[in-house]
């Protein structure tokens, strides 16, 4: 049986400044398909902690959804940590840049465009809410099993459901 796990990343969740809505949504989406969540882990905005967790989960065959840490603020480390955990460089994805510029115009520069920097080999996960894509990655020669999505519930809904629906059918 396939295991499913989630990471929910952000100091704002751990401090109580924001409430997590991802756990219950993922459980609902999986349950509707007769599947269940195997594990969940909350992580702060600590690059070493995030990288260590990802290195561990990349070595397993679990399908993992990660929420948070892919924005453009200084505490958004998840993209960099995923690249480090995979031992690949970060590269700017032209398709993601085009979506960000289409949404934000000139205000995409200088900071929002960083949201188009993904681990080498990443696939985009379209986001119809604000056109800032999520991404999926996996170890070399493996199917992509890790899906990185926005951390705010309103942004998760279409982007996350789209990714999960594509994966789960």
What does each model-found stretch correspond to?
Residues 1-5:
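Extreme N-terminal starter segment of soluble prokaryotic enzymes
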Residues 9, 13-23:
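Glycine- and acidic-residue-enriched helix-capping/strand-helix junction motifs
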Residues 16, 43, 149-150:
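Active-site-adjacent beta-strand anchor residues
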């Amino acid at each position: 049986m396939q295991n499913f796990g989630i990471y929910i990343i952000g100091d704002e969740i751990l401090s109580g400044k924001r409430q997590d809505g991802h756990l219950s949504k993922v459980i609902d989406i999986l349950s509707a398909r007769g599947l269940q969540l195997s594990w969940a882990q909350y992580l702060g905005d600590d690059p070493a902690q995030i990288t260590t967790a990802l290195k561990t989960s990349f070595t397993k065959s679990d399908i993992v959804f990660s929420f948070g840490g892919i924005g453009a603020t200084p505490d958004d480390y998840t993209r960099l940590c995923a690249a480090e955990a995979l031992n690949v460089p970060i590269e700017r994805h032209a398709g993601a840049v085009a979506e960000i510029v289409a949404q934000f115009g000139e205000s995409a520069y200088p900071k929002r465009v960083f949201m188009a920097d993904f681990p080498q080999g990443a696939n985009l996960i379209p986001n119809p809410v604000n056109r800032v894509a999520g991404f999926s990655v996996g170890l070399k020669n493996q199917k992509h099993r890790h899906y990185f999505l926005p951390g705010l519930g309103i942004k998760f809904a279409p982007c996350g459901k789209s990714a999960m629906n594509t994966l789960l059918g």
